[in-house]
Amino acid sequence: MGLSRVRAVFFDLDNTLIDTAGASRRGMLEVIKLLQSKYHYKEEAEIICDKVQVKLSKECFHPYNTCITDLRTSHWEEAIQETKGGAANRKLAEECYFLWKSTRLQHMTLAEDVKAMLTELRKEVRLLLLTNGDRQTQREKIEACACQSYFDAVVVGGEQREEKPAPSIFYYCCNLLGVQPGDCVMVGDTLETDIQGGLNAGLKATVWINKNGIVPLKSSPVPHYMVSSVLELPALLQSIDCKVSMST
């Protein structure tokens, strides 16, 4: 790590600042209720949602070939057909997809203590939101949780030539804020993108948010720091700056 003070912090969005996984689970529960009450599905409702969850986790999205709405509606259509058999039911798939999506967005909120932390941090350093993913999906989340006003800049991977962990997107972020990689800290919950990307770009430090106490694989990227909550960040940044003061 360099001997300059931290001048900028890059934050991941999903499962770092907002509980995307929890919001997604709530969306799935609403779909299960719909399938059971309106369409009289029984255990098939949960099986369908489990199948969709697997499809989402393996999703490969190419914006030049299709739109995210079509792709994700197809996940539901395939899951329903795989579970129930018979002809494809696009109309039901659309109903499930839009209920899941709207419920999910309703529950994507910035907690009050996270808002307070960002507000205080921004008095000391520049803040940038750096999120991977499809442009439409991520912009809808950003609008739903009303987080844009807490940042000096917002960068969505799906709008750039490359996403995390490519160094180029980190250099782009540095240029936006007028800082050097050695001035910046990356904070995120995903070792393979947030942490590896920060390491690839030569950032001052990487901070892994490990809410569930996961033991990483030996082959995983090694973060400079690990915390269980993003709310631990202000104290950690102070400690990083103290090390700089003692070294200079």
UniProtKB/Swiss-Prot annotation:
Q: Name one GO biological process term.
A: N-acetylglucosamine biosynthetic process
Keyword check for Magnesium, yes or no: yes
Give the reaction(s) catalysed: N-acetylneuraminate 9-phosphate + H2O = N-acetylneuraminate + phosphate; N-glycoloylneuraminate 9-phosphate + H2O = N-glycoloylneuraminate + phosphate
Residues annotated as binding Mg(2+) are 12, 14, 189
What are the coiled-coil residue ranges? none
Gene Ontology MF, one: N-acylneuraminate-9-phosphatase activity
Q: What cofactor does this chain's UniProt record say it requires?
A: Mg(2+)
What residues does phosphate bind to? 13-14, 131-132, 164
Describe activation and inhibition of this protein. Inhibited by calcium. Inhibited by vanadate, sodium orthovanadate and phosphonate.
**Protein EC:** 3.1.3.29
Work out whether the entry's keyword set contains Cytoplasm.
no
Task: Supply the Pfam families for this chain.
Answer: Hydrolase
Which keywords are on file for this protein?
Carbohydrate metabolism, Hydrolase, Magnesium
List the GO terms this entry assigns under cellular component, sorted alphabetically: cytosol
Q: In which pathway does it act?
A: Amino-sugar metabolism; N-acetylneuraminate biosynthesis
Q: Which PANTHER family does the entry mention?
A: N-ACYLNEURAMINATE-9-PHOSPHATASE
Q: What does this protein do?
A: Catalyzes the dephosphorylation of N-acylneuraminate 9-phosphate (Neu5Ac-9-P) to N-acetylneuraminic acid (Neu5Ac or sialic acid). Can also use N-glycoloylneuraminate 9-phosphate as substrate.
Protein family according to the UniProt entry: Belongs to the HAD-like hydrolase superfamily. NANP family.
Under what name is this protein listed? N-acylneuraminate-9-phosphatase
Provenance organism: Homo sapiens (Human)
